[in-house]
Curated annotation (Swiss-Prot):
The keyword rRNA processing applies. The gene is nop7. Residues 312-334, 494-680 are annotated as: Disordered. Residues 359-476 form the BRCT domain. GO terms for molecular function: ribonucleoprotein complex binding; RNA binding. It comes from the Eukaryota. PANTHER family: PESCADILLO - RELATED, PESCADILLO HOMOLOG. GO terms for biological process: maturation of 5.8S rRNA from tricistronic rRNA transcript (SSU-rRNA, 5.8S rRNA, LSU-rRNA); maturation of LSU-rRNA from tricistronic rRNA transcript (SSU-rRNA, 5.8S rRNA, LSU-rRNA). This is Pescadillo homolog. Its main location: nucleus. Residues 584-593, 602-626, 654-664, 671-680 have a biased composition (Basic and acidic residues). Residues 502-528, 540-559, 573-583 have a biased composition (Acidic residues).
Length: 680
C-alpha cells in the first residue's frame, strides 16, 4: 500500500507562494522586495485555483512562483537590503531612546537613495545577466532613454532628489554627444507629447521621446518610488551602453565635465571629448643599434628592380583598357539604383534603396545658425550638431557655449525665428545709430541683408527628407506646410499625405467623386428646370390643339425621376438597355409635343465632361460587379473556415479603402479651393 500523500506538499500549493510568505522568506522589506522583482524580472503569477494554492487567499492575494523566490535567495543585493533593514531598525531604536546624536551618526552611515541619489550596492551583475550581448541592451534602450530624459526635465522634490536628476541629465548629454560624433541620428518629429528622435546604432533603430522644457508640475497621484526604481536600473544600463559606444569610436569615457559651465546652462558645451587612440594605426619602428643607419644602396637597387617588374603587368592592363574600342560588350558601372517591384499587382510595397548625392551628416555643415531667444535652444543645438553644423550662435540669455552671442555677426547665414513678423520701427537719431552698430542685438523686426530667416520646422523637415527645403515656405509669418511623421510606414491602399494625389487615386476616381457631388448639388435645379419646361409645353399644346389628348401625357410628372436616372450607370446590360429604351421613348414624346405645338425641337447640348463622368461611373460599376462575381466564384471552392477569413479580409480592406478615399476627396476639395499649403 502506497504512502498517503500529505496535503500541501505538491501541486499548486507547492508551486506558488504568496507575497507575504516571499517577503518573510527573503527577510527584506516590502519596498526592497518590489525593487528586487523589478530588477530581476520576476512577475506575479495567477494560479488556476487560488484556494488550492493557499487556503487563506482572497481575490487580491498576489502569488509568485516558488522557484523564482528560491532563485532570489542567492542574489547578492539581498544581503545589502538586509544590512539596510538592520541599520534602519537601529536608528528607530535610538530615536525611541531619545539619543538623537547616535541616530544622526547611524543616519550618516546609512545609504538612502531617496536623499543621496546613489546607493552602496551596484547593479552591474544584473545588467550583464539580463543583457548577455550588447545588441540586447540596444534593443531595450527605447524605454530607458524616454525615462531618463523625462527625469532630467523634472524639478527636484522629496521623492525625486536633485542628484538623481543631475545624473540623468549627465547620462543623456553623454549619449547625445555620441550621436553627434557618430552621425547616428536619423529622424525627429514634433508632437504634442514632446519631440521624438530616432537613431540607428549598429543596425538597431532606437526611438525615444523627450518632453518639452516647460515648467513641470509634479502631482501626488504618481508613484515616484516605483519610477525611481526603474530610473536606478536604467542609469546603470545607459552607463554601460555609453561606455561601450564611446570606446567603439575611440573616445575616453567618461568625458571631461566642466561643472562651472554647466551651472551657466552650457548643455552640450559643458563636456569635452578626448580620444584614446584605439583606432590609430601605429607605424612599425626599426630596431637599430642606437643610430639610424641608411639602407644598403645595392639592396635598394634590387628592390626597385623587382617592384618595376611587378608593376609592369598592371601598366599593360591599363593601356589595353584605354585603347579598347567603345563597342565591346563590357559591363559598365552605372549610378542608377535597381528598383524593387512587387511580384504581384496587389503585393506589398517593397522598401526601395535610396541614394542621396549629399551626405545627411553634412547637411548643415556649410551654414552658420543663430537661434533667437524664443526658440528651443537645446533640441535645435542637438539636431544641428548631429547633422554637421559646427557654428551655432544664440542670445546670451540662453546660456553659454555659443559660437557667437552677436546677432549682427556678418558670418551668420541662417537665423531661426519663432515670432510673428513685426513692422520695422522708424530710424533713430545718428547718435543712437552709432551705439547700435556695436550692440549685439538688432531692433525688433530688423533684418540683416543676405541672411535667411526661417521657422524651426524648417530644420526638422530638412533632416527628415534628407535635403534642404525651400526657405521661403518657412519664412516668419508664413503658413507652414504640414509637419508629417517620418515614422509611418507606407502601406498599399492607404492614404499617403506626402505623395501626389495623382499617384494614389484610382482610375477615373476624380470624375466619379465630382459627378457624385455635382449630382447631389444640381438635382434640385434639374428638377425645377424640367418641371418649368414641361409646364410651358403643356400650355402651348392646350392653346394649339384645343384640348387634344396626347398619349402618355399623364406620365409627365415622372420625367424628373427618369431624368435623374439617366446619370446612373446601372449594374448589368439589361438595366443599360432599359435606360436606353426609356431615353428613346422620352425623346419620341418630346418630338410629338414639338410637332403639335409647331415649335422646332431644341436639341440638348451634351456636356463632354458630364458624359465622361457618366461613363466613368458606369465603368467603375461594371468593374466592381465583375470583381464581386469573381470573388463569389472563388468562395464557392473554399471551405467554410477559409471563406470566413476571406470575408473578414475583404471587409477590412473595403473599410480601409473607404477611409483613404474620404481623405483623398477631402484633400482634392482643399486643393481645388486653393487653401492647401504649398508643397516642396
Amino acid at each position: 500500500m502506497g504512502r498517503i500523500k500529505k496535503k500541501g506538499t505538491s501541486g499548486q500549493a507547492k508551486n506558488f507562494i504568496t507575497r507575504t510568505q516571499a517577503v518573510r522568506k527573503l527577510q527584506i522589506s516590502l519596498p526592497d522586495f518590489r525593487k528586487l522583482c523589478i530588477w530581476k524580472g520576476i512577475y506575479p503569477r495567477e494560479p488556476r485555483n487560488k484556494k488550492k494554492a493557499s487556503k487563506s487567499s482572497t481575490h487580491s492575494t498576489t502569488f509568485y512562483y516558488t522557484k523564482d523566490i528560491q532563485w532570489l535567495l542567492h542574489e547578492k543585493i539581498v544581503d545589502a537590503f538586509r544590512e539596510q533593514k538592520a541599520l534602519e531598525r537601529k536608528i528607530s531604536k535610538a530615536l525611541g531612546r531619545g539619543d538623537a546624536s547616535d541616530a544622526a551618526r547611524l543616519e550618516r552611515n546609512a545609504s538612502r537613495p531617496e536623499k543621496t541619489g546613489k546607493t552602496k550596492y551596484n547593479l552591474d551583475h544584473i545588467i550583464r545577466e539580463r543583457y548577455p550581448t550588447f545588441i540586447d541592451a540596444l534593443r531595450d534602450l527605447d524605454d530607458c532613454l524616454s525615462m531618463l530624459f523625462l527625469f532630467a526635465n523634472l524639478p527636484s522634490t522629496s521623492t525625486v532628489p536633485a542628484k538623481m536628476i543631475a545624473r540623468c541629465e549627465k547620462l543623456c548629454l553623454e549619449f547625445e554627444h555620441y550621436l553627434i560624433v557618430s552621425n547616428s541620428l536619423r529622424k525627429s518629429f514634433l508632437s504634442i507629447k514632446g519631440i521624438y528622435y530616432q537613431a540607428t546604432i549598429q543596425g538597431q533603430d532606437i526611438l525615444w521621446l523627450v518632453p518639452y522644457r516647460f515648467n513641470q508640475r509634479v502631482t501626488g497621484d504618481v508613484d515616484f518610488r516605483i519610477m525611481g526604481t526603474f530610473v536606478e536600473f536604467y542609469q546603470t544600463l545607459l552607463g554601460f551602453v555609453n561606455f561601450r559606444l564611446y570606446t567603439s569610436v575611440g573616445l575616453v569615457y567618461p568625458p571631461k565635465f566642466d561643472a562651472a559651465r554647466d551651472d551657466q546652462d552650457a548643455g552640450l558645451g559643458a563636456f569635452s571629448l578626448e580620444g584614446n587612440g584605439i583606432g590609430a594605426i601605429e607605424q612599425p619602428k626599426q630596431i637599430t643599434n642606437g643610430d639610424a643607419s641608411k639602407p644598403d644602396p645595392k639592396l635598394q637597387a634590387e628592390i626597385d628592380k623587382l617592384m618595376l617588374q611587378l608593376n609592369a603587368p598592371e601598366k599593360e592592363v591599363e593601356e589595353t583598357t584605354k585603347t579598347s574600342p567603345d563597342g565591346e560588350d563590357e559591363e559598365q558601372a552605372t549610378e542608377t539604383i535597381d528598383k524593387f517591384e512587387p511580384a504581384a499587382p496587389g503585393g506589398d510595397i517593397l522598401m526601395q534603396p535610396s541614394y542621396s548625392a549629399t551626405d545627411p551628416s553634412t547637411l548643415f555643415s556649410k551654414f552658420t545658425f543663430f537661434l533667437s531667444r524664443e526658440t528651443p535652444r537645446q533640441p535645435l543645438e542637438f539636431i544641428l550638431r548631429a547633422f554637421g553644423c559646427k557654428r551655432i550662435g544664440w542670445d546670451a540669455v540662453l546660456g553659454e557655449g555659443a559660437f557667437t552671442h552677436n546677432e549682427s555677426d556678418p558670418s551668420i547665414t541662417h537665423q531661426v525665428v519663432d515670432r510673428p513678423p513685426v513692422q520695422v520701427q522708424p530710424e533713430e537719431d545718428e547718435e543712437v545709430k552709432e551705439d547700435n552698430q556695436t550692440a549685439q542685438r538688432l531692433r525688433p523686426g530688423a533684418r540683416v541683408p543676405g541672411r535667411i530667416y526661417i521657422q524651426p520646422q524648417w530644420i526638422w523637415d530638412c533632416i527628415n527628407d534628407e535635403e534642404l527645403k525651400r526657405p521661403d515656405l518657412y519664412a516668419p509669418g508664413a503658413q507652414l506646410p504640414p509637419h508629417l511623421s517620418p515614422f509611418v510606414k507606407k502601406v498599399r491602399g492607404q492614404y499617403d499625405p506626402s505623395a501626389p494625389l495623382e499617384d494614389q487615386e484610382r482610375e477615373d476616381e476624380e470624375l466619379e467623386m465630382d459627378s457624385g457631388s455635382e449630382d447631389e448639388a444640381d438635382v434640385s435645379d434639374e428638377e425645377a428646370a424640367v418641371q418649368k419646361q414641361d409646364l410651358v409645353t403643356a400650355m402651348d399644346v392646350d392653346e394649339t390643339a384645343e384640348g387634344m389628348d396626347v398619349a402618355g401625357s399623364d406620365d409627365e410628372s415622372d420625367e424628373a425621376p427618369d431624368k435623374v436616372d439617366e446619370s446612373f450607370g446601372g449594374f448589368s446590360e439589361a438595366e443599360d438597355s432599359e435606360d436606353e429604351e426609356e431615353t428613346a421613348a422620352l425623346r419620341r414624346q418630346r418630338e410629338l409635343e414639338a410637332e403639335l405645338s409647331g415649335v422646332a425641337l431644341q436639341e440638348k447640348e451634351v456636356d463632354p465632361r458630364a458624359k465622361a463622368k457618366t461613363d466613368a461611373k458606369k465603368k467603375a460599376a461594371k468593374k466592381a460587379k465583375e470583381e464581386d462575381e469573381e470573388l463569389e466564384r472563388s468562395k464557392m471552392m473554399m471551405s467554410r473556415k477559409k471563406r470566413k477569413i476571406l470575408e473578414k479580409m475583404v471587409y477590412s480592406n473595403k473599410k480601409k479603402d473607404a477611409e483613404a478615399e474620404a481623405l483623398r476627396a477631402k484633400r482634392r476639395k482643399i486643393e481645388k479651393s486653393g487653401k492647401a499649403a504649398p508643397r516642396e
